Amino acid sequence: MTKGILGRKIGMTQVFAENGDLIPVTVIEATPNVVLQKKTIENDGYEAIQLGFEDLSTKRANKPQIGHAAKANTAPKRFIREIRGANVNEYEVGQEVKVDIFSEGDIVDVTGISKGKGFQGVIKRHGQSRGPMAHGSRYHRRPGSMGAIAPNRVFKTKNLPGRMGGERVTIQNLKIVKVDPERNLLLIKGNVPGPRKGLVIVKSAVKAKAK
């Protein structure tokens, strides 16, 4: 069954394996989450647990947020996300979920919002090749042909300049190198989406290869 927790990306560092290999890792701080609600097939048509992360001041929370959190005997939460596919029988409303649900060597998927890059051209945004930069070329970094004349329009799938980044991105099959329950930290091999202090969701890998 799926396990998951919400956290914040702290940054990157490196650790040494027992054989001396240098491993780049991303540090994720996941303070205890609270189960706010359990979704069941009978009531909702699917199974999931709803987790809350980071307390929100009651001055900044509205009445629905305060009332929803009160059912779990907790403070309103800044971030609320669902973990689908979790075994709801293992959780109770108001229960805390900590980093120790994962262990060293687990394979996980990490979801976050990618860094915003602003308005970018087709070379940076889509990896398009540029034209010659010399010898009288008048084509350098432009998008190029918009398509054939016959349709009298530009197709929706045409790669064009525009806003880049700021999208929900999931990186799959990342390995947990270390779990630190005392400091609520997860060390995950490689990089994860988003800037420092960005919200991330760490879940059991969907496509993890069987050992």
From Swiss-Prot:
This is Large ribosomal subunit protein uL3. GO terms for cellular component: cytosolic large ribosomal subunit. Pfam families: Ribosomal_L3. Keywords: Ribonucleoprotein, Ribosomal protein, RNA-binding, rRNA-binding. It comes from Geobacillus thermodenitrificans (strain NG80-2). Belongs to the universal ribosomal protein uL3 family. Residues 126-147 are annotated as: Disordered. The keyword Nucleotide-binding does not apply. NCBIfam families: L3_bact. GO terms for molecular function: rRNA binding; structural constituent of ribosome. Part of the 50S ribosomal subunit. Forms a cluster with proteins L14 and L19. GO terms for biological process: translation. HAMAP family: Ribosomal_uL3_B. The keyword Ribonucleoprotein applies. One of the primary rRNA binding proteins, it binds directly near the 3'-end of the 23S rRNA, where it nucleates assembly of the 50S subunit. It comes from the Bacteria.
